[in-house]
Amino acid sequence: MTQRIALVTGGSRGLGKNAALKLAAKGTDILLTYHSNRQAALDVVAEIEKKGVKAAALALNVGDSTTFDAFASEVAQVLAQKWGRTTFDYLLNNAGIGLNAPFAETSEAQFDELMNIQFKGPFFLTQRLLPLLQDGGRILNVSSGLARFALPGYAAYAAMKGAMEVLTRYQAKELGGRGISVNIIAPGAIETDFGGGEVRDNAEVNRHIAAQTALGL
C-alpha cells in the first residue's frame, strides 16, 4: 500500500501543528507549510519524524495568490525527491488569521486581508494543487463556530468562514467525479496563539466563551 501524504497549510503552530502531529501519529507522512517562522516549522518536522514517518516544510503566503504556481512546483519537486511520487493524498486548508473588529469599524484593508487569506487563498491554492492531488483523495477546509452564531466583533471573519462553507459544498459536487471528498470542520474556541492568543490569554474573552458553554469550561 502506498504511504499516505497530507499537505497541511499553517502547520507550524496552533491547530495546524496539532493536526499534523495527530496525522503523523496515525502513520501519515506530512508536508506542512509555514508563513515566516522557518525554525518553528523545522521543529515540527523533527517532532513528526520522531514518530517514524517522513515530513517536510515549505514556505507559503496563503494571502498572495501570485505565488501559488511557484509553490505548486515546489510541492511537486519535494514529492519527487522525498517520496518518489507525483501526488499527495490529503489537503488540509488550515492557514489563516483572525480579526476582532466591530462591523462599523472594520477597514477595507482589514477586509481585503481576511478575504485574501481566508477565502481567495484556499480557493485558488486548492485549484492550483488539484493536478497534484491523488484521485480518491481528501480535502478538509476549516470554518468556525462563528459562522453558526453571531458574536459582535467578528462580522468580517465569520463572513469569510461562511463563504468557505458554501465553497466546500460546490467543491464536493465538482470533484466527486475524481473520487475526491471535500468536507469542512467548524471548531469552537481553542486556546492557541491564533489571533494573537486572544482566546488563550484574554481573561474577558475566556469568561465570555465559558458563559456560552453548557459546562462553563
Cite the ranges covered by each PLM segment:
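Substrate-binding pocket helix/loop in short-chain dehydrogenase/reductase
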Residues: 102-103, 107-115, 205, 209
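Alpha-helical segment proximal to the catalytic Tyr-Lys
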Residues: 131, 173-174
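Active-site helix of classical SDR
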Residues: 126, 160, 168
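Conserved glycine-rich Rossmann-like NAD(P)H-binding loop of the short-chain dehydrogenase/reductase
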Residues: 28-43
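Residue(s) in the substrate-gating loop at a strand-loop-helix junction
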Residues: 144
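A glycine/serine/threonine-rich, flexible loop-to-helix segment
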Residues: 177, 189-213
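Conserved glycine-rich cofactor-binding loop
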Residues: 12-13
